[in-house]
């Protein structure tokens, strides 16, 4: 269970929809990016900067971000911890 995750430059994504955060340097991922562009499923959130991570969603959309994969992963962890804290408060009533 995740909330909205900041992927840079004021862009946020629904964390529950992301299935992978990967480094974009390999040839297969470059092909995946090109295929998504042809299919109209590429979302470029880099604001013209270098793509540092590719996020793959459960709807097969490919999201490009200028933020490092490790940074985005840390934001997922922080979001999960915050949601767990809120759920614990609710459980205690």
From Swiss-Prot:
Checking Pfam families in the record gives: RemA-like (PF04025)
Which InterPro entries does this UniProt record tie to the protein?
RemA-like
Organism's domain of life?
Bacteria
The record's similarity note reads: Belongs to the RemA family.
Protein known as = Putative regulatory protein Fnod_1678
- Give the species: Fervidobacterium nodosum (strain ATCC 35602 / DSM 5306 / Rt17-B1)
Taxonomic placement: Bacteria, Thermotogati, Thermotogota, Thermotogae, Thermotogales
């Amino acid at each position: 269970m995740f909330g909205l995750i900041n992927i840079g430059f004021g862009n946020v994504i629904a964390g529950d929809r992301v299935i992978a955060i990967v480094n974009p340097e390999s040839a297969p991922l470059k092909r995946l990016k090109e295929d998504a562009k042809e299919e109209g499923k590429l979302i470029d959130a880099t604001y013209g900067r270098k793509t540092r991570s590719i996020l793959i969603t459960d709807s097969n959309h490919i999201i490009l971000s200028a933020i490092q994969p490790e940074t985005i992963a840390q934001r997922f962890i922080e979001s999960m911890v915050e949601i767990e804290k809120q759920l614990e408060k609710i459980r205690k009533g």
